Amino acid sequence: IETIIGDVHIPSSNTTPESYLVQKYFAQMVEAGCQICVMEVSSQGLMMHRTAGIPFEIGIFTNLAPDHIGPNEHASFEEYAACKGMLFRQCRHGIANVDDEHFDMVLAGHTCDLETIGFSDRADYRASDMELIGRPGYLGVKYHVSGKIDMDVEIDVPGRFSVYNSLVAIAVCEHFKVSQEDLKAALKVVKTKGRIEMIKVSDDFI
């Protein structure tokens, strides 16, 4: 867990730092010339008002499950979902996974504009024709997205969850008018530390 400002990496003990640190880091980002900040806002961070007063441009919901929280983090799963939902009364625009079984619970009472992603016909950004790609030393997934955009996508991180994550990225990039060419190129090479990182042993093993 860390805060990254340009080439500077600042370790953090919390997913969402304390409010005074959030504001301190925002100030440092402005001084460094940052124009956009991406942050993970945890349910506890929202519950403890660490992001209070911040008018987020976009809020994102991908999924929710009981095993996402520890025994001392929330009094109940319902409280957890309600805290997650606070983000969508604090942002101008929401992007949410309509396939998730807790979609309605989390988005209840939202005050933002809302777009949806998923495999469902209800989704504004709909994934279809998902196919696992396997080559010597390589695993990925490809699919087609339709609705508010029409394009084929390939990601070198396999799994259905990767489709959901990339759909969110596509919706966000559409908001900022990123070209399809740049979007496709970025999705093809994006990596997340510790998430299905490939270790090549030989062409026969991964």
List the predicted regions and their residue ranges:
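Short beta-strand-centered segment that lines the nucleotide-binding/catalytic pocket of NTP-utilizing
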Residues: 1-4
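Conserved nucleotide-sensing/catalytic segment adjacent to the nucleotide-binding pocket
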Residues: 9-42
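Short low-complexity, flexible loop/linker segments enriched in glycine and/or proline
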Residues: 10-11, 52-54, 198
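Short, conserved loop/turn and helix-capping segments at secondary-structure boundaries
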Residues: 13-19, 54, 74-78
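Short hydrophobic/charged patches on amphipathic alpha-helices used for structural packing
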Residues: 26-27, 48, 85
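Acidic, Mg2+-coordinating active-site environments of NTP-dependent enzymes
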Residues: 30-38, 57-205
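Conserved helix/coil segment N-terminal to the catalytic DExD/H
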Residues: 45-52
